[in-house]
Structures are given as C-alpha cells and as structure tokens.
Amino acid sequence: MGDARDLCPHLDCIGEVTKEDLLLKSKGTCQSCGVAGPNLWACLQVTCPYVGCGESFADHSSIHAQVKKHNLTVNLTTFRVWCYACEREVFLEQRLAVHLASSSARLSEQDSPPPSHPLKAVPIAVADEGESESEDDDLKPRGLTGMKNLGNSCYMNAALQALSNCPPLTQFFLECGGLVRTDKKPALCKSYQKLISEVWHKKRPSYVVPTSLSHGIKLVNPMFRGYAQQDTQEFLRCLMDQLHEELKEPMVAAVAALTDARDSDSSDTDERRDGDRSPSEDEFLSCDSSSDRGEGDGQGRGGGSSKAEMELLISDEAGRAISEKERMKDRKFSWGQQRTNSEQVDEDADVDTAMASLDEQSREAQPPSPRSTSPCQTPEPDNEAHIRSSSRPCSPVHHHHEGHSKLSSSPPRASPVRMGPSYVLKKAQVPSTGGRRRKEQSYRSVISDVFNGSVLSLVQCLTCDRVSTTVETFQDLSLPIPGKEDLAKLHSAIYQNVPAKPGACGDSYSSQGWLAFIVEYIRRFVVSCTPSWFWGPVVTLEDCLAAFFAADELKGDNMYSCERCKKLRNGVKYCKVLCLPEILCVHLKRFRHEVMYSFKVSSHVSFPLEGLDLRPFLAKECTSQVTTYDLLSVICHHGTAGSGHYIAYCQNVINGQWYEFDDQYVTEVHETVVQNVEAYVLFYRKSSEEAMRERQQVVSLAAMREPSLLRFYVSREWLNKFNTFAEPGPITNHTFLCSHGGIPPNKYHYIDDLVVILPQSVWEHLYSRFGGGPAVNHLYVCSICQVEIEALAKRRRVEIDTFIKLNKAFQAEESPAVIYCISMHWFREWEAFVKGKDSEPPGPIDNSRIAQVKGSGHIQLKQGADCGQISEETWTYLSSLYGGGPEIAIRQSVAQLPDPESLHGEQKIEAETRAL
C-alpha cells in the first residue's frame, strides 16, 4: 500500500462524487451478473456509472477496469478508493487540496472546497494530516485495518483482529516498545509489534499483509505450514505461547517464594476444609490454557489536561490517539452521563492479573492498600499442582500440536487435558526435573499478566472425606455446549459433565451468499419468537460456564485413588476460579469427533455484551474485587466441520462501535448483529468504574503541576497496567531494577524506554493507594551486578575452554583405557549455560536417566540411553565442579594378556596332565 501522502496521478479522471450517490449505488446490484452487495465497487471515471461485484463473486469491477481502462474505483461498503494503475489505495481529500490550488476543470465551479468531503464522514476512512485529533477520533477511528488473506489464512486474520482489539495487550506493544526485545528466533514479538503499529497508526493502509507473522508462526509450529485451513483457537494458543516465550522475564526470588508458600498452604487439606465448602462450590476441571499474560492498551485514562496525562504515557503517536479518546470517555463518565455498552467495554477493563506485580512488590515492606491485594498474585504458580513443570505456563496441549501437522481441517483435535469437563486427575507430586536440583525459575510476561488466571481443583474421597487440592493456570476456558437434557439437569442442580471433543473445520470455504445469510437470519428470528417448548431452551454462556464448573463424580472406571485409604474409592471432583484474568478468553467447543465422522454443534449460544458476572464460579480464597466482564471481540466460524470461514466482530476502543473484520474488509455493524452471531471464541475484559475514577484523580494531580524537590521514576510497564488494568496491583519497579536496587548493566543503555518520571504528588498518591515500589529517585548502574556478570563470563569461558581442551585430547587418543558416559539431558543444560543461553548453571550431574542396576548391584548403561561419551579426565573435571553421578564406565581397563611362550607352556603341561 502506498502512503496516504503520495498523490495518485490518476485523480484527474474522477468525476464529481457525492455521498448520496454512493449510498444509492450501494443498494443496487452488479450491472454484469446482478449480484447484490456487500462489497460492490463503483467506477469513479467521469460519466461512468458502472457498478460491479468484487473478488467475493465474479470480480466484474476488475474486468471493467481492465477493459475500459478506468483506473479508479470505490468500495461501496467501506468507501475506500483503489487505483488499478498504481495498485494502491488513494485518498480523495488530497485531490481536493491540490486542485483547489490550481484551477481544476471539474471543480472550477466551486470557489472553495466544501466544508467536508462527502467521503469524510465514513468512519473507516483514514484521517487527513490537517484534521484535529478529536475529529480524527470521532470520524476516522484507528484500528480499522483489514488483513489480506494469504490462502486459507482467515483463521489467523480473525485471531489477530480479536487480539488487536484487546486494549491491555495492544497498548503494551504501542507504548512499551522498549520492552519488546528478544534474541530468540523467529522474533515473533517483533513481527507482532510491527503489525499492531501498522494497524493502529494514524496513516494506516486499508489493509495490511501479515506475511512476517505468518512466516514466523510456521517456523514455530509446522502444523500451520501450507495452505490448509486451521483452527483459530489453536493458532491463538500457539501465538501467545511463543510471545510469552520471547518476552518472559524471571520473577524476583521473593515473589516465587510467596507463590510456593501460598500453594503449599492450599495443598492436601482434610475434612475441615470440606466442611466449609460444598463439592459444587469448589469444583474445577482442567481448563484449556495457552500462554501467559500481557499488558495493555492505553485506555482508560482519567479526564483532565492532555499535557498532564502525557507525563504518564509514552509520547507514541498511536498511543496518544487511544489515550485521548479514553480521556473523553472518562470525562463523560465523571459527568454522570449514561454510556453505551461499547464505551463501558473500552474503559472498564482492567485486570487482576496485575497480581504478578503484587507478588513482586510484596518483598518490599510497603503500606497495605485495598488494591494491592489483587487476586492474581499467581504470576505463574510454582505450585504442587505441577500442572506446569516448565517455566512457561502453557498447557500440555501445545505439545499435542505436532501430532496434527498433517491435518487439513480447521480445528485440530485438542488434547483431553485441555477439555473442560473431561479432565485427567493430577497427583500433587513434584515433577521430575531430570536431576536438576537447582530451584526452577518462575517467569512472567505481558501475555501472562493479561491472560493468565488460575483455578482451584479439589478432589474429595467419599469414604474418608479427605480433600486434595491442586492449582492450575489457564489462559482460556474451553466450555462445552450443553444439550437440552443437559440443560434440564443443570437447572435441576444434578448436572453431570459429559466429555466432548473439539474438532476440525475445513480446508476451504465457498461464500454462502445472500440466500444462505437470509435463511439463517430468518431461522434465528423465528426461533427467538417461538416458545421454548417448541425449539427447546436457549443456551446461554452462563449455562456453558455452569456445565464446565459442575461437580464430577469419580466412580466406576474413573474411581479416585485415595492416598489415605490406599485404594480406589468413589469421589467427587469440583473446582472454582482462584484468580480472574484481566482478559478472559472463552472457547466454545463446537467441533466434535466420533470414530467414523465429525460434526459441528451449531446451537446458538447467547452471550452478554456487558456485565458477565463470574462471582458464582469463584473460590472462597479468591480476593478479586472486580468480577464482571464486558465483551471485546468475538470470533465466528461459518460452515461445517469439513469446511468453513472465520470472521471477527470487534468493538473499536475509540468510538465504541462494533465492526466486522472479514479478512481485508472492515464493515460497521449494529450490536444486535453481534449478539446473533454463532460465537466460537469470545474475549471479555474486566470492567471497573473505580479504576476509571482512580485514573481521573491521577490525571488531575498531574495537571496541577505542583512544584516538588524530588522526581520519582516508575516502571513504564506498571504505569501501562495502571492505565489499562482494573486491578494493576502494587507498583512494580523491578522490571528495570536488579535485586540490589540499581539498573542491570544490560538494561542501562535503554533505560529511558523502561521508566517514566512522575511528580512527587502523583507518586505519593499512587504509593499510598497501591503500595509496592521501591521508590527510585536516582538511576545508576549496579556495580555488584557488573562484577557478577564479569565473574560469570569468566567462569563460562574457563569451563568451555577446559572442556574443549580435554575433549580434543580424548579424540586424539586411539585406545582410551576407560570411557565415561554422561547424560545428554544434563550436558545440554550445561552447554546452554556456558554458551550464555541460560543464566543459571545446571545442578549436579544426574546420570539416573541412563543408568540401570544389575542384580549384583553393578551400575551399567541403560540400553538405548541418551548419553554422550567423555574421557576420564573430562568426567573428573565436571564432577569436581558440579558433583553428582553415578559414574558409568562403558570400557574399563583391560588386564595385560600373557605372552605366547608362557601360554604355550601352560597348554603343554595341561595336555600331559590329562594323559596321566
């Protein structure tokens, strides 16, 4: 796409254009084939009235342009203008500016340009440079950029549009660009940041081509290679996992200790807890999770001076646009005006995942505050629930992806572990770490901060009443769609969960056309007007949640192995939400696979646009004060289990309107259209009026500009949380500080991207309200960290040089007396450390994976073990540094053979002895 400032030389060919003419033509049909809209194209050539269909039909508009040499055409749905000769979008406002300077034949009748161009009122149009900020926000909101289909890539486009309209995540990439740093390939976070910047930039194109991100995701997961349609939910999980992996940072040790303490407290309680809680009250199933949490979007600011607020924000052009609109919305709220659903969604969405910050801050003795006890203090629970033994909190289902790399269907079959009602019991045992005795590091990222929640799962033995608990982290909830009988049981409070398998949707999708759309619309209208006894009860999202969290009896083939009874017993498993995420991702399991066939559950599930209350599903231990959510975006799948097409419906954060994102086409729709869609994935955001009032107060303080003697540095990332989260948690300055209170040497050169300077009055207010810290008035490089870094680099250099030297000598030895074996699992950890890929050294050498003990007690190498061979000197060197074992020698010293003469003499004596 060409830039909006580039002038198309073919603009002189345009006839007189009015908005009324275009609206009239949009109600017509293609003059070649008679098909109706949407997305008809009108020729803009002088005196040419032609209207043709687009690429979704026979593309007669392009044929007309090629035959008649009429270069300019306008889309009658989006009102964007395309030049076939220049092969890019053009902007008619620039034509006016040029032609008014030099007399134009077609505009010579006008002495001055009209007050507003006919196309200017269309919300999707790109703003002129000369337009005021408010006019740009009101008439031409950002973020309405389509995405080109790269070949059955609608699953990716719909997912990216839904994420793009999640303010906490988007604002992080727009305003905290300095934190988007990684040395991990394929640097997907960089591709995503670039894509978001293009989509939300003031001079955005009509659509973007997400080639870089598509290429990166294919490198990460081979399942997405080729041109087969894939499941948008699987894509979301894979994308967020990779973003977390690239952006994750180690958590402060004190935070991890608090997490462990919290988890141990909730583990293996007995009947006393059972007396306080009913099975249905605390039940939980294995949720479908994905990556971690993220930070946010620049919304939800308080009303006040624009300059004052800029002290709290990065001066990024795209970020300012979103912030300005939110200030307007906050002012409207403070005046007591009634707001639309969409406005509430924009502002009221903060996150209790800010608890990650809370934990980090708790190591500082700070004054307590109501907001500092945000429930999501589990950045990444290091709990005994060992749901995640790895550093990132991704669900095991991601390993399952590889098994479907050859599938051509839309939603690949998900692992049972991810499925809501059909879960697998997990014992509270420490996962094997392959002999790595060092403390496993906990990590957090913007993904985990935004999307991570946790659930408390309890299993009760019905014989001894023992209750064991497990904490699991989730990033999305995969909910079953209950049938008529299930609904009746649910409403009777005796519902039993029924396993359901999410399935696959097709490779390709041919347009359903207007007839199918009208038939479906009429069907839904008739259903809504017909008594429920005829069609059956209406399924709501709350019903799906109730089905997911209903108690599950463990009996028959699924009996519970009770550790107290030491045998299989009947039991009950139940769960509740322990920590609410800022952005709640809900996945409705519409695809099911049987042995011989697959099918799609097309039941309409009604869902609220605002006010989704999760209080009925919260655990007693949950401390979140914000429990209601407003809808941000919906991903829909049209078609069957064999073929289909994905589109997204998203609410624009700037004007509060709903839009349909169908690949490169973006169309405004009414909220009633959104309520009637067949939802597949929904994104909800926390809503909090208190958070908006808090932002307004901070902006007012900043606007006063009271003189102060001290300046305070605050983490830009935490400030972004404050602007976009409902519960940002305590102030977290550890994102730019080391454990000694200084700046880590590797962050000092871009420290300006990590901090924001606040006046003393603002800092004191935030500190008294949220706690945390520590207070920072001076930035300096930490000398202790510098010494440690130099010592660590020297240690790595010595170890790797010594190993290379000893290994060379081993390779040169023709017949070594003894060869030692070492576990490749441990060796890879050591190699990652000495090469600088891992900051922590490995634990003691652990050869238990490759060793087996014979009856005599002799240790031998296990058959087919993953091991490497090293010399005795190398083993001695590594063992002296790290310890561990056991020693495994596969070729020991051989005793010296007797000389031939003595051997011959012995044989002669033996022969004579036998003769006698």
Curated annotation (Swiss-Prot):
The gene is Usp20. This is Ubiquitin carboxyl-terminal hydrolase 20. It is found in: Cytoplasm; Endoplasmic reticulum; Cytoplasm, Perinuclear region; Cytoplasm, Cytoskeleton, Microtubule organizing center, Centrosome. Zn(2+) 2 binds at C30, C33, C53, H60. Interacts with VHL, leading to its ubiquitination and subsequent degradation. Interacts with CCP110. Interacts with DIO2. Interacts with HIF1A. Interacts with ADRB2. Interacts with USP18. The keyword Repeat applies. The lineage of its organism: Eukaryota, Metazoa, Chordata, Craniata, Vertebrata. One of its GO terms (cellular component) is endoplasmic reticulum. CDD domains: Peptidase_C19R (cd02674). The UBP-type zinc finger binds 3 zinc ions. However, it does not bind ubiquitin, probably because the conserved Arg in position 55 is replaced by a Glu residue. Ubiquitinated via a VHL-dependent pathway for proteasomal degradation.
